[in-house]
Regions:
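Flavin-dependent oxidoreductase catalytic core characteristic
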Residues: 1-151
């Protein structure tokens, strides 16, 4: 059960770490949470949803074109992690904007937002690449690469 501390610890344990570790599990959970909210709102366009979402409302303005696409609400795990990385950065941008509102140096805020914007743009390009790799099964014949290496 994920609502119990023992269940949460199992999810965050070694067998469930995929790419970089437990951070990827968190990115996946971010995506799942946002996708659930999108389903409830009956909204499939990511930019439209983020523009109305409290934690990303102003940051979404930086991505009028970049995030203006329909999200498949049943993504594979790898894509959930990629989307979570994007969403995490957009939320961080919102927090950065709020820091600027409270008087933090505007030049540092502007620089930070530019860096995050470029990072999100780059990650969206990777995310939107639809070339999904698949498992190759029964590849025994002709697959011993050592046979093709000159010693």
């Amino acid at each position: 059960r994920l609502d119990h501390v023992a269940g949460r610890s199992v999810v965050d344990s070694r067998p469930f770490q995929i790419f970089e570790g437990s951070n990827d599990v968190l990115y996946q959970q971010i995506s799942e949470s946002v996708l659930k909210s999108m389903r409830l709102a009956k909204e499939r366009n990511l930019h439209a949803f983020l523009s109305d979402f409290e934690m990303t409302r102003r940051a979404a303005d930086y991505f009028d074109d970049t995030l203006d696409f329909e999200v498949d609400l049943s993504l594979p795990q790898r894509k959930l992690v990629e989307l979570g990385r994007i969403l995490g950065r957009v939320v961080t941008m919102e927090f950065t904007i709020e820091m600027g509102d409270r008087g933090f140096r505007s030049d540092l805020i502007s620089n930070c937002l530019q860096v995050f914007q470029k990072d999100v743009d780059s990650r969206v390009t990777t995310y939107r690449n639809h070339d999904l790799t698949e498992v190759v099964e029964d590849y025994v014949e002709g697959s011993a690469w050592l046979d093709y290496v000159n010693a």
